[in-house]
A protein has these predicted regions:
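Peripheral interaction segments used for macromolecular assembly
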Residues: 1-90
Length: 90
């Protein structure tokens, strides 16, 4: 339940690495049971949606911090997790 609450808290927050904004969390992807977040749908500055795995993100006040932009996975991975999980906003 704590993980789910942390996932919900990340909605609409900026995703940043070393002070650089990479995008914004637009949805939380939950596991198949809808109980735990597995990652985030991030709308990036280039207009593309990418998948950010939940364990790689740190909620820090008003933003989500990641160690590297390489942690944002391509659309294919986002589609996989959407298909095998549940979007919070669905």
């Amino acid at each position: 339940m704590v993980a789910l609450m942390r996932g919900v808290e990340a909605l609409n927050k900026r995703v940043m690495t070393s002070g650089i904004e990479l995008g914004r969390v637009v949805d939380v992807i939950l596991d198949e049971a809808g109980e735990r977040p597995v990652g985030f749908d991030v709308l990036c500055g280039d207009g593309s949606h990418r998948f950010l795995p939940f364990p790689t993100a740190r909620l820090e006040g008003e933003h989500v911090e990641v160690d590297s932009s390489l942690l944002l996975l391509e659309r294919e991975q986002l589609d996989f997790y959407r298909k095998h999980g549940r979007p919070l906003r669905a």
